[in-house]
């Protein structure tokens, strides 16, 4: 019980102290993400962390704060086109998601960097490009925690493809929008990956939590 209390306390302190700088994630979803990361950090696992889809840096800032709170010695890498959403495919079609179009949610790389500089936090390693263009050589070894926020089917599938050979045996993977009817491609990509890889899936808020 003490361990569980400590995990919640650190995450909640961060959420209470610092602002959420965009409307693309809410406090509940962010809390789920941070608590899962904190469990990994508390376990003492050594390795690296990746985030595919960082937008203006909202989640990246909180991830960095939590890593700093634990004196995390591994690498933190973020990946984004910084050019907005890519084109949809058939797998993403949903009447509830008509507002999600190519080019939406555009945030320049310099905006991400400026948001980090305002806080004085250490920048992660930034990779600019479409997820389809990244290869396993672009991601670090020994991934212990991954957050995929690609919105569309191919973006999530490409994130898995790039990281597949780099996940540690007991990695935790969080995928945004798994339970979001407006973005059905995210769930399709996750379900396809799970059919080929033994892992445990739970869903909280709109997030898929995958534990290998």
Show which residues each predicted segment covers.
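A short alpha-helical cap/connector motif
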Residues: 1-174, 178-212
